[in-house]
Amino acid sequence: MKTSVNLAGVELKNPVMTASGTFGSGAEYSEFVDLKELGAVVTKGVANVPWPGNPTPRIAEVYGGMLNAIGLQNPGIDVFCERDIPFLKQLDRKSVV
């Protein structure tokens, strides 16, 4: 069965992608999920400088679910390029940053 898709001119092996923010760059989940089965990894947002995000509390339970406001916490582009890009490259999958 053909599972490849063309998404805005980018060929993906299949249409399954991670959700931005919840999956980091995937390294944290690699022992639980075969990341090479994904069509693409959508990374957490990254800024030009490290960003601490919002102060705690960041999560609140509400009737029917929860709310979160992490505040785009990230290590900055230098750390992302040094640590995450090599990891993403070895997956042989498309990455959306």
What are these regions (language model features)?
Residues 21-25:
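Short beta->alpha connector loops
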Residues 1-17:
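N-terminal amphipathic alpha-helix/helix-capping segment at the start of soluble metabolic enzymes
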Residues 2-6, 26-93:
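Glycine-rich, positively charged N-terminal anion/phosphate-binding segment
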Residues 96-97:
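Conserved small/polar residues in nucleotide/adenosyl-binding loops
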